[in-house]
Design a protein with these regions (language model features):
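Single conserved hydrophobic/aromatic residue that forms the stacking wall/gate
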Residues: 405-414
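Substrate-binding rim/cap in mid-to-C-terminal beta-strand-loop elements of soluble/periplasmic
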Residues: 81, 158, 162-177, 250-259, ...
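Formylglycine-dependent
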Residues: 93-126, 134-207, 213-225, 237, ...
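A long, amphipathic alpha-helix that forms part
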Residues: 192-199, 226-265
Length: 414
């Protein structure tokens, strides 16, 4: 083959290939830990100004009927990752040590043979990264959890509740320590720094990034309160931590825009579950329920999407009911990529809804399972403690205290 003869043709094709790559949107999922829908200004929150998160809503689309897939960390994260209801993946409360997991009738880690949204993007040629809290397996006495790379991530940095925690933030086996080189009050700053490094490294190619900070989870430790353990769950400590998180997320979004990738980046902002403590339901916007509850305050979350290239700014959707399990098929559709081969998830493709082109009503029901036995962690206030099964169907939500197996033989029905 005469390469000199064909080089002009190859050169002519390169711009086309580059153009096609540039049209693939980047995806960033900002997944806050234990944030209530009433925490931030654009949802009516008044604790402290949250100008950067509010601007994200002003520049994009805010949803008022979005649900997490569970009222607590691990199953919520598994639902978003797999597009499956947590009941199907065998994880129904936060992953703990082996004995506690057994008492709560759950697995020790997310099965890496199950679907993974990141893997679908990786298969499509995206650079993939996870930065922040993991909590889908590993840590404590669970030493056989799969590597985060097994779920489709090229790069990762994670906290102690993971198979390979980052040394800078895990000097001890707890959420933070004075011995950590990155202090508790600088966690989101650190995660944003690492996220910016990831974006700069991959800005010439499509990327998929989880940015999952954990500082909205107690203990809240602003620098000036670092020695006052008794104040780490007070509103006085909460407010500056929220303000700092907003500041750092604003820095990240500004950097995306300065790097010229913001226009073609889908930013999802949401939370894994409801707040704890809720400060007398203020953090849940006065919805009943908190973290560890299937009432609305435990599972109805803030949800904002910014995608300047495709989403008209300043929109609010009050009608469409979305859930974390929908994100896998929906984001794949918006990005123009395929889900994994044989994928059959519980989530639905709501790409038109996500892009602000429709306020379509949900065609399938949602379900949640939490608290099936006495070993689960429940809200301290009995008013917030819910039945352990819930279904949302249309405008109705059913909460039930038991699940019956309907055998053909009536004598088996109890």
């Amino acid at each position: 083959m005469n390469l000199k003869k064909h080089l002009p043709w190859l050169g002519a094709l390169l711009p086309i290939a580059n153009t096609q790559a540039e049209t693939k949107p980047n995806v960033v999922i900002i997944y806050i830990d234990d944030m209530g829908i009433g925490d931030i200004g654009c949802y009516g929150g008044k604790f402290v100004p949250t100008p950067n998160i509010d601007k994200l809503a002003q520049d994009g689309l805010l949803f008022n009927q979005y649900y997490s897939s569970a009222p607590v960390s691990s199953p919520s994260r598994c639902g978003l990752t797999t597009g499956l209801f947590p009941l199907e993946v065998g994880i129904n409360t936060f992953l703990n040590d082996k004995a506690a997991n057994k008492r709560c009738e759950q697995r020790n880690f997310l099965d890496d043979k199950l679907p993974s949204m990141a893997r679908a993007f990786q298969n499509a040629g995206y650079s993939t990264g996870h930065i922040g809290k993991w909590h889908m397996g590993g840590g404590r006495d669970v030493h056989n959890a799969p590597s985060i790379k097994n779920y489709g991530f090229d790069e990762y940095i994670s906290t102690y509740e993971s198979p390979d925690p980052e040394p800078a933030i895990t000097a001890t086996k707890w959420i933070w320590s004075d011995k950590d080189s990155v202090k508790r009050w600088r966690r989101t700053e650190y995660f944003v720094d690492k996220s910016i490094e990831f974006v700069k490294k991959h800005k010439g190619e499509p990327f998929f990034l989880n940015l999952w900070p954990d500082d909205m989870h107690t203990p809240w430790v602003p620098e000036f309160k670092q020695k006052e353990r008794k104040s780490w769950e007070t509103q006085e400590a909460f407010a500056p931590v929220l303000a700092e998180m907003d500041k750092q997320l604003g820095r990240f979004i500004k950097t995306l825009d300065e790097l010229g990738v913001g226009e073609n980046t889908i930013i999802i902002f949401t939370s894994d579950n409801g707040p704890a403590p809720s400060f007398k339901s203020v953090r849940s916007a006065y919805l009943r329920g908190t973290k560890n509850s299937l009432y609305e305050g435990g599972i109805r979350m803030p949800f904002i999407v910014r995608y300047p290239k495709k989403i008209k700014a300043g929109q609010v959707n009050n009608e469409s009911v979305l859930c974390a399990v929908d994100l896998y098929p929906t984001l794949c559709s918006v990005a123009g990529i395929k889900t994994e081969k044989g994928y059959k998830g519980d989530g639905q493709n709501y790409s038109k809804v996500l892009l602000g082109k429709s306020e379509a009503k949900r065609k399938t029901d949602l379900m949640w399972d939490f608290g099936r036995n006495k070993h689960f962690g429940f809200p301290g206030n009995p008013y917030d403690r819910s039945p352990h099964l819930a279904i949302r169907s249309g405008k109705w939500k059913l909460l039930v205290n038991c699940l019956l197996y309907t055998s053909p033989s009536p004598r088996d029905i109890s």
